[in-house]
């Protein structure tokens, strides 16, 4: 046993991978015997890593959750109207590099809204062409990328050197920045900026609590909201809400929606450096209710512990589970009719109140997160088949077939998959 408030208790380290005194992770698992052999430098390197708050101290490439920011910048500076259409053929060339969309076969013609819903890299890069480097960098600063948020927690990371500037941003860097790759940010930077996109454009300094009270309940300090700036106009904010609502109803974020509620948001999948390792950060950034955002939520999964990492479902599932508990607790009432599956899932098939009928969006393939459609459980299961094998077969069952080759098409990368072996016979994704 150990006191969670005692940040220097070595027993908190039991079971984690040991770091050396320079903070590099080793393969050794910490036991009491290992703790007994640690010198002070190694011990404190491990304790500091254990209590580090990922949300404010760790940086990462945010990936496609940055796409609403790009669209908002284009709308706000007048380079986009929202009525544009773009053709995605699977890739574009910038600065001598071929940069791919998540769907190498291309998404075809897309509106601005559809580009956000399908998370199309190629469409976003074309928007970046219209926005231009100078405008993009102006809004990068408005969104507080590269700057501290000054949240009232210790250890917020400095990111000034982790974003591009006018001297370092070329056409390839601008292209990849439009979909959240090539620069680093913290979670608190991203969610604070996103809140401004969906609350009418108002950027507030983030705080952990709204007041401090004594043990007898006396208020010691009130922490009032502090408005710092306006990032976008109310009209731009309304459009971003509309686009992000579509991500959940029609696009890549369907699995984030809690039963009975309408929400909005954006999925993210970013390939980590070095790219050849195929490690990913997957995420979902969202809000509720969909028509009048009051709650923001952001889930980031750093290198999911699974064979196939580039699946936003790992993050959308977290968001769905959290909001399923949080929204009723905060007295938000269901607004959407429950399907039979949702009634069963909530364990309230006999108790759920039937709401006025609304049109439920049909299930569709997740263009970014390789969303796996739910299937009815069969009465018989093959005992020798592992859970990972079952999940992989279910995922393959959702893939479309290439009419020319007969191979399956992986929706995230456009790679061709041999249905007999499950192995790729084509290239793999560049970034998403």
Where are the language model's segments positioned?
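Beta-lactam-recognizing serine transpeptidase/beta-lactamase-like catalytic domain environment
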Residues: 1-64, 69-301
């Amino acid at each position: 046993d150990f006191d969670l408030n005692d940040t220097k208790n070595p027993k908190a380290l039991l079971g984690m991978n040991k770091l050396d005194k320079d903070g590099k992770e080793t393969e050794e698992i910490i036991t009491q015997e290992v703790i007994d052999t640690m010198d002070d430098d190694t011990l404190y390197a491990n304790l500091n890593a254990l209590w580090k708050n990922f949300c404010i101290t760790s940086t990462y490439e945010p990936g496609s959750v940055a796409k609403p920011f790009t669209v908002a910048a284009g709308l706000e500076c007048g380079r986009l109207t929202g009525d544009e259409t773009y053709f995605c053929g699977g890739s574009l060339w910038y600065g001598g590099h071929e940069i791919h969309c998540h769907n190498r076969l291309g998404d075809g013609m897309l509106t601005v809204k559809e580009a956000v819903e399908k998370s199309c890299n190629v469409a976003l890069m074309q928007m970046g062409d219209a926005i231009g480097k100078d405008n993009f960098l102006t809004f990068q600063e408005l969104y507080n990328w590269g700057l501290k948020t000054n949240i009232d927690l210790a250890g917020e990371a400095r990111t000034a050197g982790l974003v591009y500037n006018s001297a370092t941003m070329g056409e390839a860097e601008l292209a990849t920045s439009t979909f959240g790759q090539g620069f680093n940010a913290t979670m608190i930077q991203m969610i604070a900026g996103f809140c401004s996109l969906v609350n009418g454009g108002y950027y507030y300094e983030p705080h952990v609590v709204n007041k401090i009270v004594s043990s007898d309940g006396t208020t010691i300090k009130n922490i009032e909201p502090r408005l710092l700036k306006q990032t976008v106009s109310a009209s731009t904010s309304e459009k971003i809400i509309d686009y992000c609502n579509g991500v959940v109803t029609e696009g890549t974020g369907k699995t984030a929606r809690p039963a009975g509620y309408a929400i909005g948001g954006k999925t993210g999948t970013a390939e980590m450096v070095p790219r050849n390792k195929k490690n990913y950060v997957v995420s979902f950034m969202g809000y509720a209710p969909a028509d009048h955002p009051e709650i923001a939520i952001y889930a980031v999964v750093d290198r999911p512990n699974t064979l196939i990492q580039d699946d936003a479902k790992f993050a959308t599932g977290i968001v769905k589970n959290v909001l399923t508990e949080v929204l009723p607790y905060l007295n938000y009432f269901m607004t959407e009719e429950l399907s039979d599956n949702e009634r069963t899932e909530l364990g309230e098939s006999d108790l759920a109140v039937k709401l006025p009928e609304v049109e439920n969006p049909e299930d569709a393939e997740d263009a970014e997160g390789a969303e796996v459609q739910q299937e009815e459980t069969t009465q018989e299961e093959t005992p020798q088949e592992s859970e990972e094998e079952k999940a992989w077969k279910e995922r393959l069952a959702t893939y479309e077939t290439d009419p020319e080759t007969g191979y399956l098409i992986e929706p995230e990368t456009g790679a061709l998959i041999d249905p007999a072996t499950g192995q790729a016979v084509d290239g793999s994704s560049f970034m998403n």
